[in-house]
């Protein structure tokens, strides 16, 4: 995937802690392909401890993987627009809460500011959703983002249609291919994919 070599990619983490195990191998792959990956984290990522791990541990892990200090404030994220422009901004996982804010032009976290700065530069933003209400109240926000210029999605599908019928999660292993397409301002297809791992 040599097309990613030398590309400056912002990588935003939001608070879907249960999805990190699927995301971090993709960060490592981007680094191995020669991309310059700049980590960006929301306030919740840094401060929240869950059964999936402590916030500080996840931040240290992404810093160790990328070799860069995590951007953890809106002030630090703002220069990604004019002074340190990204070739592409990734938000994965993207929670329903952050998706709602992004769709409605709110910039109250470092990750959302980094996305706004990238869109301002007419560069692609890649989203990897992980939300329990993608087919519920957040459906309108999902559709709004899908029809927004310079926003692209890691293909996604229902992860548990019987127990959580409104839930949708991106297939994170498709992230590198999605970025390659997004850099050409194209959406990786198909965008709706089978993502159910159960036996029902």
Curated annotation (Swiss-Prot):
Recorded catalytic activity of this chain's protein: (S)-2,3-dihydrodipicolinate + NADP(+) = dipicolinate + NADPH + H(+)
SUPFAM superfamilies found in the cross-reference section: Homo-oligomeric flavin-containing Cys decarboxylases, HFCD (SSF52507)
Induction: Is not expressed during vegetative growth; is expressed at stage 5 of sporulation specifically in the mother cell compartment, under the control of the sigma-K factor. Is repressed by GerE.
BP GO annotations: sporulation resulting in formation of a cellular spore
Keywords, sorted A to Z: NADP, Oxidoreductase, Sporulation
Keyword NADP found: yes
Protein name: Dipicolinate synthase subunit B
Species annotation: Bacillus subtilis (strain 168)
Name of the encoding gene: dpaB
């Amino acid at each position: 995937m040599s097309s990613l070599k030398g590309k400056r990619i912002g990588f935003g983490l939001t608070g879907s802690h249960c999805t990190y195990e699927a995301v971090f191998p993709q960060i490592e792959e981007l680094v191995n392909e020669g991309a310059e990956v700049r980590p960006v984290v929301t306030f919740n990522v840094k401060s929240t401890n869950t059964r999936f791990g402590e916030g500080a541990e996840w931040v240290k892990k992404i810093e160790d993987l990328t070799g860069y200090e995590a951007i953890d404030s809106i002030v630090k994220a703002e220069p990604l627009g004019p002074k340190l422009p990204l070739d592409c901004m990734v938000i994965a996982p993207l929670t329903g809460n952050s998706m709602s804010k992004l769709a409605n032009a709110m910039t109250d976290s470092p990750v959302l500011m980094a996305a706004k700065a990238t869109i301002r530069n007419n560069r692609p933003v890649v989203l990897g959703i992980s939300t329990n209400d993608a087919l519920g109240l957040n459906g309108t926000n999902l559709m709004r983002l899908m029809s927004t210029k310079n926003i692209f999605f890691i293909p996604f599908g229902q992860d548990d249609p019987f127990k959580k019928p409104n839930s949708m999660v991106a297939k994170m292993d498709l992230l590198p291919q999605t970025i390659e397409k997004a850099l050409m301002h194209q959406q990786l297809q198909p965008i709706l994919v089978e993502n159910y791992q159960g036996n029902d």
